[in-house]
């Protein structure tokens, strides 16, 4: 099977008019309008792949998953969680315990950067029964977020006129 290799300048030159097909995985290139608005590309043909735009980017929810960091062998008393600068540090340690194969002890340290727009004073942490440690906290209200609501602007009076009176 012959595969045509295109020069990057000519690749997807008419991108907004021709959406990606199922196997046209284009990584590292910019997004087009149809990537943001998938309903535009679905009207052309049902055989074109639908682009998935993640609507949760502005929802204030972020998630870090790592299966190796499960803490199912630890109780909440064995875990120490603290915020240091812009990081959350997790330390887990339990004393030596006996299991089916002998004695075992576990200890781990993890450190994750917190988002810059997170209200650190109201972060909560919970440990589920299946060993998933969950952090949650609200976003800070930035000046851009607060500008969407109504905000009064005071009007002051100046004693001198700003322009010469017209004759």
Curated annotation (Swiss-Prot):
It holds the Pfam family HSP20. GO terms for biological process: lens development in camera-type eye; negative regulation of apoptotic process; protein refolding; response to heat. Zn(2+) 2 binds at residue 101. InterPro entries: A-crystallin/Hsp20_dom (IPR002068), Alpha-crystallin/sHSP_animal (IPR001436), Alpha-crystallin_N (IPR003090), HSP20-like_chaperone (IPR008978). Zn(2+) 1 binds at residues 94, 96. Gene3D superfamilies: 2.60.40.790. Residues 143-167 are annotated as: Disordered. PROSITE patterns: SHSP. Residues 147-161 have a biased composition (Basic and acidic residues). Signal peptide: none annotated. It is found in: Cytoplasm; Nucleus. The modification N-acetylmethionine is found at residue 1. Contributes to the transparency and refractive index of the lens. May act as a chaperone, preventing aggregation of various proteins under a wide range of stress conditions. This is Alpha-crystallin A chain.
């Amino acid at each position: 099977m012959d595969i045509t290799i295109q020069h990057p300048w000519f690749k997807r030159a008419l991108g907004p008019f021709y959406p990606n097909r199922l196997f046209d995985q284009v990584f590292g290139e910019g997004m087009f309008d149809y990537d943001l608005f998938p309903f535009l590309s679905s009207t052309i043909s049902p055989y074109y792949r639908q682009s998935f735009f993640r609507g949760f980017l502005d929802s204030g929810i972020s998630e870090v998953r790592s299966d190796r960091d499960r803490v199912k062998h630890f109780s909440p008393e064995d875990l120490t969680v603290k915020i240091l600068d812009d990081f959350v540090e997790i330390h887990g340690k339990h004393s030596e315990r006996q299991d089916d194969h002998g004695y075992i002890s576990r200890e781990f340290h993890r450190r994750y950067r917190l988002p810059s727009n997170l209200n650190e004073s109201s972060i909560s942490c919970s440990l589920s029964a299946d060993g998933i440690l969950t952090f949650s906290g609200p976003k800070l209200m930035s000046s851009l977020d607060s500008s969407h609501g109504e905000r009064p602007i005071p009007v002051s009076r100046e004693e001198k006129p700003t322009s010469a009176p017209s004759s």
